[in-house]
């Protein structure tokens, strides 16, 4: 997929020295956790505690915070980040969101999950991360985003975030991508919203989402440009 290859190129430039790894990802199965373990191990070797595909919480907060404020029907609002990796999205929501949130980050890679748990408990400077709201919570669990039965019950999240995970899974074939979409909808509450962040053009992504979520509303909002690249937030709402 051109979008993922482009994102990998940008990510490699940002990371500084991972060209060989990006090539490995382009030719490997995204469902193989060993590939992601290698990626996240290399990330941990650097001085930056988190690594983001596309963009991080800093860029996303202007879009997310108004949605969280508007959606405050239950406190704290439950948020799931599928394929969280070592992104700053979960930690940013936990430490900087003024609204109460209960955030769960799941990832296939045990290396990524262990790193984020360590960051949560010890922080970059040895201090635990502090919540932006006293009622906020943050947890990380190793799990396959295509099968969340062991970690998430049906209808248990008001907001599901997917930042680049669909892009990666789709490289392994459409059945896996649509299984990911189905699982996101299973754990989403009837009033909830799935948000996919990607640089993939709406002319490509929207028909895929409409096919995989009949009866739902698919909306698109342009984000950025960040680093010279325009991104998109794909919002899918409604019960299947």
Segment roles from a protein language model:
Residues 2-50, 54-59:
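N-terminal, positively charged/glycine-rich alpha-helical extensions of SAM-dependent methyltransferases
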Residues 52-76, 92:
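Conserved alpha-helix/loop element of class I SAM-dependent methyltransferases that forms part
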Residues 78-148:
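Class I SAM-dependent methyltransferase SAM/SAH-binding core
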Residues 146-160:
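A short acidic, Gly/Pro-enriched loop at the edge of an enzyme's catalytic core
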Residues 158-174:
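A short SAM/SAH-binding and catalytic strip from SAM-dependent methyltransferases
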Residues 175-190:
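A short glycine-rich, Lys/Arg-flanked "PGG" loop and its adjoining helix->strand segment in the class I
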Residues 191-198:
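Conserved beta-strand signature within the Rossmann-like core of class I S-adenosyl-L-methionine
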Residues 222-240:
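Core SAM-dependent methyltransferase catalytic element
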């Amino acid at each position: 997929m051109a979008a993922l290859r482009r994102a990998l190129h940008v990510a490699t430039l940002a990371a500084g020295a991972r060209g060989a790894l990006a090539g490995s990802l382009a030719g490997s199965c995204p469902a193989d956790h060993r590939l992601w373990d290698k990626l996240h191990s290399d990330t941990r070797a650097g001085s930056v505690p988190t690594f983001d595909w596309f963009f991080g919480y800093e860029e996303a907060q202007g879009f997310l915070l108004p949605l969280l404020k508007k959606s405050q029907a239950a406190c704290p609002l439950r948020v799931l980040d599928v394929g969280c990796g070592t992104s700053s999205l979960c930690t940013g929501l936990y430490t900087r969101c003024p609204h109460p949130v209960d955030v769960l980050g799941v990832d296939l890679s045990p290396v990524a999950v262990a790193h984020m748990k360590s960051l949560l408990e010890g922080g970059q400077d040895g201090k635990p991360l502090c919540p932006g709201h006293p009622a906020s919570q943050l947890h990380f669990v190793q799990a396959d985003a295509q099968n969340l039965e062991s970690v998430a019950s049906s209808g248990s999240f008001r907001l599901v975030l997917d930042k680049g995970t669909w892009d990666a899974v789709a490289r392994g074939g459409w059945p896996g991508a649509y299984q990911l979409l189905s699982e996101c909808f299973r754990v989403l509450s009837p009033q909830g919203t799935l948000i996919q962040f990607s640089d993939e053009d709406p002319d490509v992504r929207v028909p895929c989402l409409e096919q995989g979520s009949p009866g739902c509303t698919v909306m698109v909002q342009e984000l950025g440009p960040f680093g010279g690249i325009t991104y998109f937030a794909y919002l899918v709402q409604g019960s299947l």
